[in-house]
């Protein structure tokens, strides 16, 4: 088998190609111009939106005679080459990189276009005012609420019927005259649902059927110069609503009241006759919610922790004199809080009021920063003079009460036997607790 060189292979391939495609006999020299206008996008790089004519409609194009005129005027600059004969796919597409032929304004400068303005027939005139009263093909650019307001103002009456609104719209807008009657349902829905319109019942002495409609006076300013404007909620309105919700809650009202009274106490100095909300009122206010009733005892237990935190804040902020007062304040505040349930047991009104005042003063002292040593001596002196029997009985009850963890079990003697037999082991294991036995781990 002979070995063929590349030129011979090319000649054989050319002969076979011409045998299969006899229409290519005229282009033997290889001067065939392949049209790549369908895939070329070089014109898109040079295209500019600023050079395009915005007033010209997309469907309007340039006549071939106009293109020929521009070619003669400008000397063929940026003008596309004519497509080959019979090539319908390349019509209107550029053969060389450049601007597309569909835009007439991109083919010449403004001066040349001004000279050749009388040859251009594809451009439309500027938008003229549309007469909606006679044009049945263009829908008016007004909302249904605006149409209702326009009908009410055109009637020069305080109230108007629904049929009068229909008749005014069909009389002034030809589009609704020939359109489907579904727009009447939209008019009725706007009258019923829009808060700017209100229905006025018909009086007994007025003839006819149905009620009247009018614009709500508080929303009359929304219809200005034929345009129905919607009100926007100001940014401050949200803040005021949020503040009102926060102030309406019981906890926030209680804290605001305490802050106000603490500020008054700070200016009054060390006066002990300070009025504070009672603890019973606070517990009653919290117990109104059924979900929080189980948390009342827990809050009483954790009250000492919160008092300790407030004392630390006061010491660090400089309200108390030294850190030595910290232990005194903590002890007195915890003592005052524990005195409250004991006063409820005795059911003595005079004693409970005195105890609550002492607790309130102790809490105020932890926040305001009064001298605790002076108060401790005065309070002890008053207790000795006013109610000595009451306080003695109260503290005697506290001394008699013992906590569960303070109760100690008496050690019971275990009978031991000198016999190291089975009896000794049995007696030893019988006295062991349940968690000490080996059976509990099995």
Swiss-Prot record:
GO terms for molecular function: DNA-binding transcription factor activity, RNA polymerase II-specific; RNA polymerase II cis-regulatory region sequence-specific DNA binding. Belongs to the FOXJ1 family. Signal peptide: none annotated. This is Forkhead box protein J1-B. Keywords: Activator, Cilium biogenesis/degradation, DNA-binding, Nucleus, Transcription, Transcription regulation. Its main location: nucleus. Pfam families: Forkhead. It comes from Danio rerio. InterPro entries: FH_FOXJ1 (IPR047512), Fork_head_dom (IPR001766), FOXJ1 (IPR047513), TF_fork_head_CS_1 (IPR018122), TF_fork_head_CS_2 (IPR030456), WH-like_DNA-bd_sf (IPR036388), WH_DNA-bd_sf (IPR036390). It comes from the Eukaryota.
């Amino acid at each position: 088998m002979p070995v063929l060189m590349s030129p011979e292979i090319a000649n054989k391939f050319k002969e076979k190609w011409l045998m299969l495609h006899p229409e290519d006999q005229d282009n033997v020299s290889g001067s065939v111009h392949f049209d790549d206008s369908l895939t070329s996008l070089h014109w898109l790089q040079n295209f500019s939106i600023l050079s395009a004519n915005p007033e010209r409609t997309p469907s309007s194009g340039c006549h071939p005679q106009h293109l020929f005129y521009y070619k003669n005027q400008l000397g063929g600059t940026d003008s596309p080459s004519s497509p080959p004969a019979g090539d319908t796919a390349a019509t209107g597409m550029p053969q060389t990189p450049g601007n597309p032929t569909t835009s007439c304004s991109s083919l010449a400068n403004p001066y040349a276009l001004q000279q050749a303005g009388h040859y251009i027939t594809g451009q439309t005139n500027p938008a003229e005012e549309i007469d909606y009263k006679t044009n049945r093909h263009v829908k008016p650019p007004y909302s249904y609420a605006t149409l209702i307001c326009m009908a009410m103002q055109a009637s020069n009456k305080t109230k108007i019927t629904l049929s009068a609104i229909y008749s005014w719209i069909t009389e002034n807008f030809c589009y609704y005259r020939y359109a489907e009657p579904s727009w009447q349902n939209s008019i009725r829905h706007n009258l019923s649902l829009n808060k700017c319109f209100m229905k006025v019942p018909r009086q007994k002495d007025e003839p006819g059927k149905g009620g009247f409609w009018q614009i709500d006076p508080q929303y009359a300013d929304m219809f200005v110069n034929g345009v129905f404007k919607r009100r926007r909620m100001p940014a401050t309105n949200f803040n005021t609503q949020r503040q009102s919700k926060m102030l309406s809650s019981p906890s926030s009202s209680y804290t605001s009241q305490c802050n106000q009274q603490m500020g008054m106490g700070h200016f009054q100095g060390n006066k002990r006759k300070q009025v504070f909300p009672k603890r019973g009122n606070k517990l009653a206010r919290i117990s109104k919610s059924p979900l929080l009733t189980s948390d009342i005892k827990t809050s009483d237990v954790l009250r000492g922790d919160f008092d300790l935190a407030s004392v630390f804040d006061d010491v660090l902020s400089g309200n108390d004199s030294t850190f030595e007062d910290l232990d005194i304040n903590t002890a007195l505040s915890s003592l005052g809080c524990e005195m409250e349930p004991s006063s409820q047991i005795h059911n003595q009104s005079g004693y409970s009021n005195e105890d609550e005042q002492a607790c309130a003063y102790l809490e105020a002292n932890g926040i305001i920063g009064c001298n605790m040593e002076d108060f401790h001596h005065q309070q002890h002196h008053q207790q000795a003079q006013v109610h000595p029997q009451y306080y003695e009985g109260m503290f005697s009850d506290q001394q008699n009460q013992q906590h569960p963890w303070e109760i100690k079990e008496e050690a019971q003697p275990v009978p031991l036997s000198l016999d190291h037999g089975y009896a000794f082991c049995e007696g030893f294991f019988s006295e062991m607790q349940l968690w000490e036995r080996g059976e509990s781990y099995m």
